[in-house]
Each structure stands twice: as C-alpha cells, then as structure tokens.
From Swiss-Prot:
Keyword Ribosomal protein included in the entry's annotation: yes
Described purpose of this protein according to its UniProt entry: This protein is located at the 30S-50S ribosomal subunit interface and may play a role in the structure and function of the aminoacyl-tRNA binding site.
The name this protein goes by in its record: Large ribosomal subunit protein bL19
Pfam families membership: Ribosomal_L19
The UniProt record lists the keyword Signal: no
Xref: PANTHER family: LARGE RIBOSOMAL SUBUNIT PROTEIN BL19M (PTHR15680:SF9), RIBOSOMAL PROTEIN L19 (PTHR15680)
A cellular component term, taken from the record's GO annotations: cytosolic large ribosomal subunit
Keyword terms of this UniProt record: Ribonucleoprotein, Ribosomal protein
Organism: Borreliella burgdorferi (strain ZS7) (Borrelia burgdorferi)
InterPro entries in alphabetical order: Ribosomal_bL19, Ribosomal_bL19_CS, Ribosomal_bL19_sf, Translation_prot_SH3-like_sf
Protein's GO biological process: translation
Gene3D superfamilies reported in the protein's UniProt record: 2.30.30.790
Family of this protein: Belongs to the bacterial ribosomal protein bL19 family.
Amino acid sequence: MDLIRKIEAQNKKNEAFVFNVGDTVRVVYKIIEGSNERLQSFEGIVISFQNKGIGKTFLIRKISSGIGVEKIFPVYSPIIEKVEVLRRGKVRRAKLYYMRNRIGKAAIKIKERLTIKKVKH
C-alpha cells in the first residue's frame, strides 16, 4: 500500500485548481490531431467530483443548442492547460445530478456565493 502512495505522489502535479461543486468554470485543454495541437475550451457547471487518488475526476455540464452536454475531466491530466473559475456557486449538495432533469434557464441557474474580503485598518 505504501508503494501505491509513493507512485501517486510522484505523478501528482500541484493541484492549482481550486473550485467546488456548483461553480461555473472554463476548462482549456489540448487536442492533438496527428501532428497538430490546438487548445479548446469547455465552459459549464461542475456537477460532481470523483475522488479516487490520482484518478480524481470532475464532471462539467453545459447546455449547447438546447441539449445537455456533460464531459468528465481528470484533475491530474497533462492535457488540461488551465481551469478558470467564472462564477462561484452556492449549493448544499455534493452531487448535482438533479440538474439533468431541469429544462431551459433553470438548467443553468445556481445561486451565487458571495465572497467578503476582510479589510485591515
């Protein structure tokens, strides 16, 4: 068991992505087609996390032309260039699978979490 943790620690890059379930994020990732390499972005709401050590993944959902599209991204994947948090969401669940049943504007509607900065005098 100790050997597994040692290998996971070597392959883990710094987890610079700080976001939670309910946040609206934009993931920029590499697509390699033959010898060409380009960047593509996917923007949506984080529905869930699967915590499996180095195999940690997150699921993003967006509505494209009235159809729900979901994509799973591995957190420690080398193809992910960056993850931008566009909006912080306020939710009370760890898995937002109920969003799949929503239609129209309600499918992307989540309350925004306000962040208050403390000012030192």
